[in-house]
Amino acid sequence: DEMFNLSELISVVIEKYNNENISQNLTPRIYFNGRKNLINRCLNNLIDNSLKYANKVEISLSKKNTNLFIIIDDDGPGIPKNEYENVFKPFYKIDKGRADSKSSVGLGLSISSDIIKSHGGNIMLEKSKPDGLRVKVFLPV
């Protein structure tokens, strides 16, 4: 594990996409002690996922008490609430909506969830306003 600037890492990841449809609202200088390469992979998986299904993606980073929150909102078709648990299973793909004609093996969310859990955190899904998907990542400081 290493201490690194998570705000900077997220910013660098977003810049690599060179996509004007990704906006960011990052609290500066938030540091995290963890495996930077794995957090980087997780961020890429989550952003890739959102971009597959949405036009606009917004990423925010904040800190409350002893938790860090990374929130990724997209304006895609969303996922039915009854599928929220299932999409974290390896190779699981929803038949309709988000899975239509998209090339995916169904591992991105599973791997991301494993990475976050290995850091003592969690990933949750909820409906984004107005209709997309919100991915909430909690990490303990």
Spans of model-derived segments:
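Conserved glycine-rich
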Residues: G120-G121
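Short beta-strand/loop element within the Bergerat-fold HATPase_c
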Residues: K56-T66
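Acidic ATP/Mg2+-coordinating residue in the GHKL
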Residues: D74
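Conserved catalytic submotifs in the C-terminal HATPase_c
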Residues: I22-N33, K64
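Short conserved segment of the HATPase_c
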Residues: I79-Y92
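A residue-level detector for a conserved hydrophobic packing site
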Residues: I39-N40
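Short alpha-helical Gxxx[C/S/T] motif in the catalytic ATP-binding
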Residues: G108, S112
